[in-house]
Every structure is written in structure tokens, then in C-alpha cells.
């Protein structure tokens, strides 16, 4: 017999958008929940995101008059991902409308469509995008929870947002207010799930630890929902998975460094896929502003060791904007983005020369040949190669055609590029000094590797059987998509499979 300290129907580990969706779904079914958050603030990794959510075919797209549908979304995923995860792909797109319908029943939660193109040219793609976003939130609407949300990414607002509003991923804290309104929850900050409690092969609870005490929490349904972040902040686990880059380069919050001891029969973790790149702070921690690539039209990214230009205005592909695949193990970094003064002027203040952001390395002015020789700290960088490629960009600008990288031919390119007076808005010549180089390293916001699950989020053993009572979603689980089909797929899948897990537990 276990000596239990507290009880609930559903124990939720983590407080990001996916975890909170699972908690709210359970509460809506009449189940009691305890939400454990490792840090002292709620919101998780999703609070650091722009909160685009890839939930296709919902009432939100219908309100916006978009010709979106579950079938179109299914076709798009199948064209990109194949049949390897067809059941989970189907569960994802078929459940998305129900998730949104449930959440919008609560007066605290409302979504809207915001244009952001799907990333790849494939059957079912929507050039306008199909992602939805939570409406900006007035902190007064959620009371004390506003002060318990993950803090702003930076101390200074550089994007002219309305003062006092909770925007982007922080607006998803509204889901926690919805959970709280059910009176069937208990939020527990500064609480680490240090181990799972197993009886006769079934997960029946967990050991909660915080700076003051330890508790044995029983899930009355014999259920634990594990949605507590990935392993991007754990250097040892990254090395075991063969994940490129360093833990200190991750852009995620400090919480996702798994401390839970799992039953030995758990399935192994899948190999992580590199999701994106970012600018790195001088002190080594990844910068919170990650849109430099999207804002610079006329740049070159030169990688190691041969000064090879890489595409700047680009979708988020299987290969990163460095031209480095996950199998390259990060050998192409650091890279340097080279651009001229017009891009500095046109960039938002987060990448401004006159107001350099304190959270990124300051660009270095100088002529292109001088810059490449004196400022790019690798002996194998060749100034003549960089100058040659700058002249090539000039020719592309005059022609309006990028024959090598095809910039400006994809709707995603056009989305980020306002008119520049030329035939191709994605091409701006590198000719107006001073010139700049921004150091670029691999980075990530989370992991795609994790616990292998079925369509209802049940964690699977190595032999494919389900572990009774254990569910996983979000960055804890292996992704349904080995790469990034569109804006908000990680958050969308986290919400859908947390919803499906809670529904399965409520049966």
C-alpha cells in the first residue's frame, strides 16, 4: 500500500499550451487535476513563441472565410510526411476542430486567423497559411494569474506592442484561467516530478519535490499525463540522442531539463530533429529575437569553411538556413550573415544599428572585403569569394531573378519582404555601406525527439505495447512531423494530443 500525500484524477506535468489544454479538457469532463510546473512561473516553452498554432479546418478559419478543410490539411501532411505516421497525422487534423471548439466555449479564450504561409509547396498547401493565434490578452481578465506567467522575453519592447497587453505565447495563459474557472484544479509551481510511481506495470502517480517538501501524488484514475517539456536543456541527453548544437544555445526556457526517473520499460527516445537556428548572445545563451533571417532581404549567409553563400529568405526546411542538416552535427557553424546598411534601416528596432538590441551581438561595419578578412574569425574565410558572391547578388537584383537559390519565387519569401522598388522584393543588392556581419549559430526552441506515443498520447514500450496510465504530449513526445510543415505545428500537435489523452483518460 502506498502512503499518498494528495490525490487527483489527472496529474499534469508542465504548464505550456499543450499541458494546459489537456488540463482544461480533463476539467471539462469533470476530472480533478494537479498541474506541476518546475519553475516559479506558468506558460512553459509556448510562452516564448509567437503562438501561431497549426490547427486546420476549425471554426476560426471558417469565420475568416478561408477555404480550409481537414481533407486539405491531411493531403498537405501526407504529401510532405508520407505514410509513416499516417494514423497520428489523421488524428491530428481530425481532432483540431474539436480542440478549438472546446476552448472557445470559455469566455476567456478566443482565436483569430493571421496570415502566415505554409512552408512547403505541396498538395493541400495554403499560400495564405491556415494558422490561428490567441487574441492579445488584458492581464486584468485573468487576475492573479497574470503575475504568475512566464515573464517577457526581453526587458524592452522593441516591436511597438500596446503597453500592458499579453501577446503571442503569453496570451495562452488564458487557458490556465479557463482551467482555474472549473474549480477542479490545483496549480503547483516550483514542483518537480522526480519519479513515476508504478504498481503492477501501471503508472498510478508520481513523486513531487519542491524546495520545502516532497509529496506522493496519486492519480485516482491511475493516470499520469506527462507534458513537461523536452530535453533541449539537458547536455547529456542531447549527446545521447546525437542532437547538433549545445544545450546552452537552446532558446527554450530554463525549465525543460527533465528530472523525472521513468520506469525502465519505457521506449527509447527518438532522435531529435533540428528545428531552427538563431542568433546567439555573446555570453553564449541563445537570443530571444529570432527573426533576423526573416527580416534581411539582401544578405548572404557564409558558412564554414569555404565561404559558401546560403539562402537567407527561405522556408524553414529540413536543411537549416545554414545549409547544415542534422547529420552534419553542427559542423557548418558558426556562420555569418552579411548585409548592408539599408537592411539595418529597414529592420525593426530588434535589429537596429541606431538602437542595437542588448540581447544580440552588435553588427560590425566596414567594407565587404575588409569585413570578411578582419572580422570573420576563421583563417579559411576568403575575402575574394565573399566579394564575388556580393557581385552575384547585385546581378540577381537587376534581373529580378535568383537563379541559384530562387529567392522571391515562394509565397513564404514574399510574406517577409515589403516592396523594395525592384522586380523581386526578396532581392536587395549588397552595395550601400557600411556593411554588417551577424554571427549565427544553430539553436532550437525544443526537441522533436521524445517518448513514442500512439494516437491518444499513450506512451509505448519498445515492443509497441502501451504503458497503462502514462501519456505524453508536446516536447516530451516524439513529434508526428520529423520536420516543420507549417507555422505552429509543434504547438498544434501538443494541444491536440493533450486533448486526446485527456479524453481517453475520461472514458
From Swiss-Prot:
Top EC class for this record: oxidoreductase
InterPro entries: FAD-dep_OxRdtase_2_FAD-bd (IPR003953), FAD-oxidoreductase_2 (IPR050315), FAD/NAD-bd_sf (IPR036188), Succ_DH/fumarate_Rdtase_cat_sf (IPR027477)
Ranges for region Disordered: 299-385
UniProt xrefs under SUPFAM superfamilies: FAD/NAD(P)-binding domain
Biochemical pathway: Lipid metabolism; steroid degradation
Biological process, per Gene Ontology: steroid catabolic process; steroid metabolic process
Cofactor dependence: FAD
Gene Ontology CC annotations of this record: plasma membrane
The EC number(s) this enzyme carries: 1.3.99.4
Subcellular location, record wording: Cell membrane
Binding site for FAD: 9-38
Domain of life assignment: Bacteria
Assigned keywords, A-Z: Cell membrane, FAD, Flavoprotein, Lipid metabolism, Membrane, Oxidoreductase, Steroid metabolism
UniProt record similarity statement: Belongs to the FAD-dependent oxidoreductase 2 family. 3-oxosteroid dehydrogenase subfamily.
Protein name per Swiss-Prot or TrEMBL: 3-oxosteroid 1-dehydrogenase
Organism encoding this protein: Rhodococcus opacus (Nocardia opaca)
Amino acid at each position: 500500500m502506498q502512503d499518498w500525500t494528495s490525490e487527483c484524477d489527472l496529474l499534469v506535468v508542465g504548464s505550456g499550451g499543450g499541458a494546459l489544454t489537456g488540463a482544461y479538457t480533463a476539467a471539462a469532463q469533470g476530472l480533478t487535476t494537479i498541474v506541476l510546473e518546475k519553475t516559479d512561473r506558468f506558460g512553459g516553452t509556448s510562452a516564448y513563441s509567437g503562438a501561431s498554432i497549426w490547427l486546420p479546418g476549425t471554426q476560426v478559419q471558417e469565420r475568416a472565410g478561408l477555404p480550409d478543410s481537414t481533407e486539405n490539411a491531411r493531403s498537405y501532411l501526407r504529401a510532405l510526411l508520407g505514410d509513416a505516421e499516417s494514423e497520428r497525422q489523421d488524428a491530428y487534423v481530425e481532432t483540431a476542430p474539436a480542440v478549438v471548439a472546446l476552448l472557445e466555449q470559455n469566455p476567456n479564450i478566443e482565436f483569430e486567423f493571421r496570415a502566415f504561409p505554409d512552408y512547403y509547396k505541396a498538395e493541400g498547401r495554403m499560400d495564405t497559411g491556415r494558422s490561428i493565434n490567441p487574441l492579445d490578452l488584458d492581464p486584468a481578465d485573468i487576475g492573479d494569474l497574470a503575475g504568475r506567467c512566464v515573464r517577457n522575453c526581453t526587458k524592452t519592447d522593441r516591436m511597438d506592442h500596446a503597453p500592458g497587453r499579453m501577446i503571442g505565447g503569453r496570451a495562452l495563459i488564458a487557458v490556465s484561467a479557463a482551467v482555474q474557472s472549473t474549480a477542479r484544479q490545483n496549480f503547483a509551481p516550483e514542483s518537480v516530478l522526480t519519479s513515476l510511481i508504478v504498481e503492477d506495470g501501471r503508472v498510478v502517480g508520481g513523486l513531487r519535490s519542491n524546495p520545502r517538501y516532497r509529496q506522493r501524488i496519486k492519480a485516482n484514475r491511475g493516470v499520469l499525463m506527462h507534458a513537461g517539456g523536452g530535453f533541449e536543456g539537458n547536455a547529456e541527453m542531447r549527446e545521447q540522442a546525437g542532437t547538433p548544437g549545445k544545450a546552452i544555445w537552446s532558446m527554450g526556457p530554463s525549465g525543460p531539463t527533465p528530472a523525472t526517473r521513468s520506469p525502465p520499460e519505457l521506449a527509447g527516445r527518438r532522435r531529435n530533429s533540428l528545428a531552427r537556428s538563431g542568433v546567439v548572445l555573446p555570453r553564449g545563451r541563445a537570443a530571444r529575437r529570432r527573426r533576423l533571417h526573416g527580416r534581411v532581404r539582401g544578405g548572404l549567409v557564409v558558412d564554414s569553411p569555404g565561404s559558401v553563400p546560403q539562402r537567407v529568405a527561405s522556408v524553414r526546411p529540413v536543411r537549416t538556413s545554414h545549409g547544415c542538416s542534422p547529420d552534419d552535427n553542427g559542423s557548418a557553424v558558426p556562420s555569418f550573415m552579411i548585409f548592408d546598411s539599408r537592411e539595418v534601416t529597414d529592420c525593426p528596432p530588434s535589429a537596429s544599428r541606431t538602437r542595437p538590441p542588448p540581447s544580440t551581438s552588435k553588427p560590425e561595419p566596414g567594407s565587404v572585403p575588409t569585413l570578411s578578412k578582419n572580422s570573420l574569425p576563421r583563417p579559411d574565410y576568403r575575402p575574394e569569394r565573399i566579394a564575388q558572391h556580393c557581385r552575384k547578388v547585385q546581378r540577381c537584383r537587376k534581373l529580378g531573378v535568383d537563379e541559384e537559390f530562387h529567392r522571391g519565387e515562394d509565397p513564404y519569401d514574399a510574406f517577409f519582404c515589403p516592396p523594395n522598388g525592384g522586380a523581386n522584393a526578396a532581392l536587395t543588392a549588397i552595395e550601400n555601406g557600411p556593411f554588417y556581419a551577424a554571427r549565427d549559430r544553430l539553436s532550437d526552441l525544443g526537441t522533436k525527439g521524445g517518448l513514442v506515443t500512439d494516437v491518444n498520447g499513450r506512451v509505448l514500450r519498445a515492443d509497441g505495447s502501451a504503458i497503462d496510465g502514462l501519456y505524453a504530449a508536446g516536447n516530451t513526445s516524439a513529434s508526428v512531423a520529423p520536420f516543420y510543415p507549417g507555422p505552429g505545428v509543434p504547438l498544434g500537435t501538443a494541444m491536440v494530443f493533450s486533448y486526446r489523452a485527456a479524453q481517453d483518460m475520461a472514458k
